């Protein structure tokens, strides 16, 4: 389709589609098409005109479907290495609801990071980078890890509406050796007063269910190190996030803490829920983030006047004209006649119409 025999083909791409072209229909969300990215994300997509990173040679160009973990059809797909002096930070479409809910309790859209997370190869080459500075850019992340070796994909997880960084990222190397070296070299380094944690990304789905905790009533002076001290006793903390006031930057007394195993999360709940921490004045509320999300959704539904499916509907009310007729009639009737009338009309409540 894209060979030299086709007059409309790109003769400089070695028979592959033009770089960044997704041959599979995706509703306009093709890789490398910044205009098709969700609002607030287009500025994070690198274009071929970027000068800080060299454009891949014709021998290494691939369509988006050919990259590992990106929904390729047939075979093992192409590779994004052999890029000479540089690579490009590919931003795949947004992660699926299930994947992102597992990661931060949010639902941000639909797309394809689940493939990358669930790819069996990802456990050996796909890394998660925690505790990134809030102002760190995708370019800086790429430059930091590209020094180790060729990269398939790298991306900082952000709120797609605001561009706000969640403080962690995924970096997928092309070789296991480079991913191992990245952990050994970059884990624990300090970047703008933030100590990075680099480790292998775990598969998504059931294996990380019930590991994310929602914590409230924390001291308003809580720090990352203090949160580690409080919760680190009960297991390996994969990710933590202290929520802060947007204006002052001070902690709001709320945090998310994700453990490596659900048993560790349950142990932390048993040990810390309703316990006053050192420096605090209120007992902590520690529960699963999923439970908090369900309670929040139920509260929102009640505020909107939406009745949950498991709540029975209210009993039927009498028509307005019958209620008005009863209101006029009962005034001239005795109590006995009112009771007799009401008994013959079980849906009427006399108190409502007095």
Swiss-Prot record:
RRM domain: residues covered: 125-203, 211-291
Record-level Gene Ontology MF annotations: mRNA 3'-UTR binding; mRNA 5'-UTR binding; mRNA binding; mRNA regulatory element binding translation repressor activity; poly(A) binding; poly(U) RNA binding; poly-pyrimidine tract binding; pre-mRNA binding
Pfam family, one: RRM_1
Gene3D superfamilies per record: 3.30.70.330
CDD domains the record matches: RRM1_SXL, RRM2_Hu_like
Record's keyword annotation contains Repeat: yes
Taxonomic superkingdom: Eukaryota
Residues covered by region (Disordered): 1-21
InterPro entries xref list: Euk_RNA-bind_prot, Hud_Sxl_RNA, Nucleotide-bd_a/b_plait_sf, RBD_domain_sf, RRM_dom, Sxl
BP-aspect Gene Ontology terms: alternative mRNA splicing, via spliceosome; epithelium regeneration; female germ-line sex determination; female sex determination; germarium-derived cystoblast division; imaginal disc growth; negative regulation of mRNA splicing, via spliceosome; negative regulation of RNA export from nucleus
Protein's cellular compartments: Nucleus; Cytoplasm
Keyword Mitochondrion: no
GO cellular component terms, A-Z: cytoplasm; cytosol; nucleus; protein-containing complex; ribonucleoprotein complex
Extent of the signal sequence: none
Keyword terms: Cytoplasm, Differentiation, Nucleus, Repeat, RNA-binding, Sexual differentiation, Transcription, Transcription regulation
Tissue expression summary: Expressed in somatic tissues, but not in the pole cells, which are the precursors of the germline. Expressed in the anterior of the germarium.
Function in brief: Sex determination switch protein, which controls sexual development and dosage compensation in females. Sxl protein is only active in females: it is inactive in males throughout development. Acts as a mRNA-binding protein, which specifically binds to a subset of pre-mRNAs and mRNAs and regulates their processing and/or translation. Binds nanos mRNA and is involved in bam-bgcn mediated repression of nanos mRNA translation.
Subunit structure and binding partners: Part of a complex containing fl(2)d, Sxl and vir. Part of a complex composed of at least mei-P26, bam, bgcn and Sxl; this complex is involved in translational repression of nanos mRNA. interacts with mei-p26. Interacts with nito. Interacts with Unr; cooperates with Unr to prevent translation of msl-2 transcripts. Interacts with how; promoting nuclear retention of msl-2 transcripts.
The name this protein goes by in its record: Protein sex-lethal
Provenance organism: Drosophila melanogaster
